[in-house]
């Protein structure tokens, strides 16, 4: 098989037509035979342990089990590459083709796709404008639906009929003197398919647009909902009838393997059991139709086929959940795709990548907003190629091997080189689940001791992170373009507003709010060293650092700035030399005879001084 490299911009998931599903699995052999249809529920032969032909593991459909060897053994070795065996019809190829070659099952009766029937909103229900409950009654053979009312006055288009009502109309229809004609009713997925084929999307969309303009309330909302679905069908050029399956795709056998265990027993994927149920019921329905079995038996078999396809696509979505050994529910196609352990989140979005690391986050209150603390050990591993290049460039070593040896020895030179390397090289921090674009942001790394990543507390709301054991991933942008994009677009200070609401997302929370409250709170209990006087704010902080006063001790501090005048005046004292002392509850002002302020003391705590100084320093620094 030729290896092709195909570049693409995006992947679009769309409804598949029956022709496309056949095209996925069908191949034409040199003798003109078309292979691809799985017709037998058998998997492997119990004596030879080789896959059964036309079964779920058929080598003719899916490719050989052994590299460069056909089923019958006539052709072995790579020199026969591409040859199709005349005896068994198997193409000589690598066994890994069994990971992507598909097959298909031709269904004896159409069945509805359970995603489009039972998911909310139900697209089949919306498109036909029939309540979901009624659609289910039709699909599972409990009620008939009128597809052509003919000239019967008691019938209308899309009217539901019970078994007894239809028998009564049928008796009138086939009477010798009956004037009724053109009456058609249906049941099951075939009836839904006929109704969907009758829907003219363009005409329906035009009619709904008029309804949206004229209608009000719930009727208008319903029209908008239908119009949105119809417009999407028109835009994607999908036929609504494709929501009814006539051909069922069979996924490649290596994605649903059967593995032999030590004791000779086999472990198999649940999908094989679900496919086997579909094939058994499909083959039984074909036989019943061939022998012209009674309608009631055929209808029951069609219902069972519908239920088996439902279980294959989404087990448990409707009806009783199909269980295997030990009453364990079988994993359907939907179970493999969806959820945290599903194919998308586990294997595609969550795959391991180079130049990345992961560790627990801890708070880094001393960091700048655009910085993160990166453990030395992790940083050395992530930036190792850059460090090696720098060591060779500076002439400290001659080759890569010597550089790696120096790194392993933990030479002291390494850390200074690492400091140079990370200077101006942003890193990306990501916290799963990345539900919005702020779940991954760029920071400038600072080397820290220990094994935990240090994160600025202000960016926690954007990541929805807290410090109770959360982990974050680190990624290194390698190219200059990636580094420039990280620096210009993804740096934390540039992601100030929430993309959802437009409101600031960088806001103090949790520990920061509690810390600010603790620093500024009134503490009525007796603290040590109350009512000291200090000549400036720095002296008060120095006394606190020397443990002469407590964080919440009330002290008088000389302050030259403006103070809000909300204090209650207690008394005024006249001092010698004509000075006046105005005493307030939290302030003392000394003035001369011209009322000019000579000195002002305020009552405060070291905690409040500390908060005020921190805010003042950060504001003056930013300016």
Swiss-Prot record:
Q: Which NCBIfam families match?
A: PRK02625.1 (NF002729), rpoC1_cyan (TIGR02387)
Please write the reaction equations for the catalytic activity of this protein.
RNA(n) + a ribonucleoside 5'-triphosphate = RNA(n+1) + diphosphate
> What assembly does the database describe for this protein?
In plastids the minimal PEP RNA polymerase catalytic core is composed of four subunits: alpha, beta, beta', and beta''. When a (nuclear-encoded) sigma factor is associated with the core the holoenzyme is formed, which can initiate transcription.
Query: What's the cofactor?
Result: Mg(2+); Zn(2+)
The protein's job, in short, is: DNA-dependent RNA polymerase catalyzes the transcription of DNA into RNA using the four ribonucleoside triphosphates as substrates.
Name assigned to this protein: DNA-directed RNA polymerase subunit beta'
- Please provide, alphabetically and separated by semicolons, the GO molecular function terms listed in this UniProt record: DNA binding; DNA-directed RNA polymerase activity; magnesium ion binding; zinc ion binding
Q: Say yes or no: keyword Zinc present.
A: yes
**Keywords carried by this UniProt record:** Chloroplast, DNA-directed RNA polymerase, Magnesium, Metal-binding, Nucleotidyltransferase, Plastid, Transcription, Transferase, Zinc
Q: Which InterPro entries match?
A: DNA-dir_RpoC1_gamma (IPR012755), DNA-dir_RpoC_beta_prime (IPR045867), RNA_pol_asu (IPR000722), RNA_pol_N (IPR006592), RNA_pol_Rpb1_1 (IPR007080), RNA_pol_Rpb1_3 (IPR007066), RNA_pol_Rpb1_3_sf (IPR042102), RNA_pol_Rpb1_clamp_domain (IPR044893)
Name a single GO biological process.
DNA-templated transcription
Q: What is its EC number?
A: 2.7.7.6
Q: Where would you find this protein in the cell? A: Plastid, Chloroplast
- Which residues are involved in binding Mg(2+)? 466, 468, 470
What binding details are noted for the cofactor? Binds 1 Mg(2+) ion per subunit. Binds 1 Zn(2+) ion per subunit.
Residues recorded as binding Zn(2+), renumbered to this chain, are 70, 72, 85, 88
What species is this protein from? Rhodomonas salina (Cryptomonas salina)
């Amino acid at each position: 098989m030729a290896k092709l490299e195909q570049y693409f911009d995006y992947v679009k998931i769309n409804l598949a037509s029956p022709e496309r599903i056949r095209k996925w699995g069908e191949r034409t052999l040199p003798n003109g035979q078309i292979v691809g249809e799985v017709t037998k529920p058998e998997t492997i032969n119990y004596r030879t342990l080789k896959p059964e032909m036309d079964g779920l593991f058929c080598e003719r459909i899916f490719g050989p089990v052994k590299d460069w060897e056909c089923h019958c053994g006539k052709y072995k070795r790579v020199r026969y590459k591409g040859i199709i065996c005349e005896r068994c019809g198997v193409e000589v190829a690598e066994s890994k083709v069994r990971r992507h070659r598909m097959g298909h099952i031709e269904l004896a009766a159409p069945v509805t796709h359970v995603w489009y029937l039972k998911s909310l909103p139900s697209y089949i229900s919306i498109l036909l404008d029939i309540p979901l409950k009624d659609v289910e009654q039709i699909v599972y053979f409990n009620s008939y639906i009128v597809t052509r009312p003919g000239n019967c006055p008691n019938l209308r288009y899309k009217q539901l009929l019970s078994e007894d009502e239809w028998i009564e109309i049928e008796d009138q229809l086939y009477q010798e003197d009956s004037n009724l004609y053109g009456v058609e009713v249906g049941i099951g997925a075939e009836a839904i398919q006929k109704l969907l084929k009758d829907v003219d999307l363009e005409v329906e969309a035009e009619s709904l647009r008029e309804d949206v303009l004229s209608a009000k309330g719930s009727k208008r909302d319903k029209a908008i909902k239908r119009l949105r679905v119809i417009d999407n069908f028109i835009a994607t050029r999908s036929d609504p009838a494709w929501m009814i399956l006539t051909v069922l795709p069979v996924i490649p056998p290596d994605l649903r393997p059967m593995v032999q265990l030590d004791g000779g027993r086999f472990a198999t994927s649940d999908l094989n059991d679900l496919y086997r149920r579909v094939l058994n019921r499909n083959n039984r329905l074909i036989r019943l139709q061939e022998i012209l079995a009674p309608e009631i038996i055929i209808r029951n078999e069609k219902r069972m086929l519908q239920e088996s396809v439902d279980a294959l696509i989404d087990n448990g979505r409707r009806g009783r959940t199909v269980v295997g050994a030990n009453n364990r529910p079988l994993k359907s196609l939907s179970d493999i795709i969806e959820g945290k352990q599903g194919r998308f989140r586990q294997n595609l979005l969550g795959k391991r990548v180079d130049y990345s690391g992961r560790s627990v986050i801890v708070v880094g209150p001393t960091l700048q907003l655009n910085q993160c603390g990166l453990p030395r050990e992790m940083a050395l591993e992530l930036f190792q190629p850059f460090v090696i290049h720098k060591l060779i460039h500076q002439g400290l070593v001659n080759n890569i091997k010597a550089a790696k040896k120096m790194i392993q020895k933990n030479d002291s030179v390494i850390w200074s080189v690492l400091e140079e390397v990370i200077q101006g090289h942003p890193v990306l921090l990501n916290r799963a689940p990345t539900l919005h674009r702020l779940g991954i942001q760029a920071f400038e790394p600072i080397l820290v001791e220990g094994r935990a990543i240090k994160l600025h507390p202000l960016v926690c709301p954007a990541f929805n992170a807290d410090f109770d054991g959360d982990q974050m991933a680190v990624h290194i942008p390698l190219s200059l373009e990636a580094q420039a994009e990280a620096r210009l677009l993804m740096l934390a200070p540039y992601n100030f507003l929430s993309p959802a609401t437009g409101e600031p997302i960088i806001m103090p929370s949790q520990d920061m709010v509690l810390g600010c409250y603790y620093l500024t709170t009134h503490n009525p209990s007796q603290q040590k060293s109350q009512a000291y006087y200090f000549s400036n704010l720095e002296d008060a902080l120095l006394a606190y650092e020397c443990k002469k006063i407590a964080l919440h001790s009330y002290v008088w501090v000389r302050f030259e700035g403006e103070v809000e005048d909300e204090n209650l005046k207690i008394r005024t004292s006249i001092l010698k030399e004509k000075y006046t002392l105005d005493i307030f509850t939290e302030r003392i002002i000394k003035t001369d005879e011209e009322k000019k302020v000579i000195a002002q003391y305020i009552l405060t705590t070291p905690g409040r001084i500390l908060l005020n100084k921190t805010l003042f320093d950060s504001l003056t620094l930013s300016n």
